[in-house]
Amino acid sequence: MKVQLDNIDIIICEMIGRMRNIVNRNFKVKDNKVGMDTSVNIDVQGFLAEYAFAKHFNTFPDFDLRPRSGSYDAFYKGYRYDIKSTRRKNGRLITTTKINPDVDIYILAIVDDTEVDFIGYAFKDELIRAENIIDLGYGDTYVLERNKLHNFKNGHKKEIV
């Protein structure tokens, strides 16, 4: 499922992502990034994915700038989504070992300039399992390979996306 973003979308996402980063760093919210990119770039990339999800499903993105740790990125069809983004074309679904009680479903999004490709999703209990813990060089993280994700095109027995 690919979502194309136009120049105005990109500008909005850049602004919100950068502002969220400033607020979170000023309020000492712990940065749980997994990777070598800067926290600013990761926050912008993350909001690009959140915004693209909202645009595709015709929901309103969360423009909130209050400091936060945890929570969810989108609410749709009764489920709370955490959208995990990467710029790696072969990216996997990755989250920290800090369990977020506010999330039902995790989504993998590949961000490539003006396009966001939603690869698939996993229910929380499919991702948060001991056998999915791997140290990728930044400490233990939950990792789910792409072939274990539910495909957006094929759907799921529960209509969630």
Q: Which residue stretches match the model-derived regions?
A:
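Nucleic-acid endonuclease domains
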Residues: M1-K77, K84-V161
